[in-house]
């Protein structure tokens, strides 16, 4: 990490299990390079009571209280949980057109539904909002996604399926079984890859590369437990 030509010493801490680096930047250009290798992360994550409560509530980009009437008339809440989660993800996939640059940083799931287009975070926000409106706890997960095209940071959804957090990706741009968790939260407000305080900056260049050993499976709507 370099800022204004000088090495940076980041302060590192955890927020909800995610690693956060806090930096004090010098005037001039700042360059941050990060690399890592990941292996099987262990067993699926159980939904805790605190997570259950938080993941049911409306949030900044996921105003589920505004879409409750729409969701309950559009979907059958009596479906088995895994089937309901997959059905909502498939519906969002059909309803939206993936369009780079089509959405604004302030757009909510309601804006996305009306526009009918967006990028991965918009797909995730709409999926989360509909699931919460159907009383299914759901949250956003920022991930590295081998097989994603175009390659970038990626946003997917975790939903409570019979007490276990399971991933669905309404974009179908990357296989869920190859995803590597970066962090999770209520929505994009909790999971931004970069947040600035006390000054201004321009993002000059961003390059993300994520690869996996072996062949990648075909993306689908089946919920998958992400370690």
Predicted feature locations:
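Linear, non-domain "peripheral" regions
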Residues: 1-69, 135
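Generic structural hydrophobic/aromatic packing signal, biased to beta-strands
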Residues: 1-2, 34, 71, 168, ...
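Low-complexity, flexible helical/coil segments
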Residues: 8-21, 66-75, 174-180, 192-197, ...
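Short, surface-exposed linear patches
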Residues: 3, 22-23, 53-59, 161-162, ...
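Short, surface-exposed, polar/charged, turn-prone segments marking secondary-structure boundaries
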Residues: 8-10, 27-29, 60-65, 166-170, ...
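Secondary-structure boundary elements
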Residues: 32, 42, 46-118, 126, ...
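Hydrophobic/aromatic-rich core segments of domains that either
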Residues: 90, 122-200
């Amino acid at each position: 990490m370099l800022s204004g030509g000088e090495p940076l010493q980041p302060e590192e801490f955890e927020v909800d299990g995610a690693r956060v680096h806090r930096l004090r930047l010098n005037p001039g250009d700042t360059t941050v390079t990060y690399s890592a290798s990941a292996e099987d992360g262990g067993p699926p994550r159980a939904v805790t009571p605190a997570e259950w409560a938080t993941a049911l509530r409306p949030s900044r980009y996921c105003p589920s209280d505004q879409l409750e009437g729409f969701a309950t008339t559009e979907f059958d809440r009596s479906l088995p949980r895994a089937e309901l989660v997959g059905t909502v993800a498939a519906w969002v996939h059909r309803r939206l057109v993936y369009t780079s640059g089509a959405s604004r940083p302030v757009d909510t799931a309601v804006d996305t539904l009306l526009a009918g287009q967006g990028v991965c975070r918009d797909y995730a926000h709409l999926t989360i909002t509909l699931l919460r409106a159907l009383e299914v706890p759901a949250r956003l997960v920022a991930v590295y996604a081998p097989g994603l095209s175009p390659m970038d940071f990626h946003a997917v959804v975790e939903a409570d399926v019979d007490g276990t957090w399971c991933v669905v990706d309404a974009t179908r741009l990357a296989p869920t079984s190859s995803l590597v968790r970066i962090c999770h939260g209520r929505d994009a407000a909790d999971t931004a890859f970069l947040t600035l305080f006390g000054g201004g900056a321009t993002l000059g260049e961003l390059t993300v590369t994520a690869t996996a050993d072996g062949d990648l499976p075909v993306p689908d709507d089946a919920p998958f437990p992400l370690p």
